Amino acid sequence: MKDQIYMELLKKLKDIVEPICEKYSYELVDLEYRREPHGWVLRVYIDKVGGVTVEDCAYISEKISKELDIKDPIPHSYILEVSSPGLDRPLKRKRDFERHIGEKVNITLLEEIEGKKKVEGKIFKVDEKNVTLKVDDSLMVIPIEKIKKALLIVEF
């Protein structure tokens, strides 16, 4: 029951936050709402073409905060944090993978594919249902629904 209530709250929060992000040309990448040692935290991860600055985070935080104060979906005090997803950001949706074609990624699978549960390679192609990775000298097709976790590999 608690999971259902949590998921409903996340959906409400997304329904409030996402239109604000879109209005100001940001993409809502992810939302987290969790209890931490210092209290409840609502984390909003945003992105935009060219990357996100500290000023962007402050600007959109103010807009989101005003709307959350009006709609008041959270019944107790919390801290709002707005940030970019970082260099080693998780990839979750088709568009996340599309944005990073040609970049290295580390993927953990829900079940083995071709005898592997973890795969590292470059994103070669993305379609509606699959991500194709170039692993060494061969291509590996991975259904997006079979991906447990995907992280960009930062190369310097």
UniProtKB/Swiss-Prot annotation:
This molecule's function is given as: Required for maturation of 30S ribosomal subunits.
Q: Name one Pfam family in it.
A: DUF150_C
Which compartment or compartments is the protein found in? Cytoplasm
Gene Ontology terms describing biological process: ribosomal small subunit assembly; translation
The principal location of this protein is cytoplasm
Gene3D superfamilies in alphabetical order: Ribosome maturation factor RimP, C-terminal domain, RimP-like superfamily, N-terminal
Which cellular components does GO assign to this protein?
Answer: cytosol
Record protein name field: Ribosome maturation factor RimP
Q: Does the keyword Iron apply?
A: no
Q: Which HAMAP family match?
A: RimP
- Organism name: Dictyoglomus turgidum (strain DSM 6724 / Z-1310)
| Swiss-Prot/TrEMBL keywords | Cytoplasm, Ribosome biogenesis
Q: Which residues form a coiled coil?
A: none
Q: Which domain of life is it from?
A: Bacteria
List residues traversing the bilayer.
none
InterPro entries linked: Ribosome_maturation_RimP (IPR003728), RimP_C (IPR028998), RimP_C_sf (IPR036847), RimP_N (IPR028989), RimP_N_sf (IPR035956)
Hey, which family's this protein in?
A: Belongs to the RimP family.
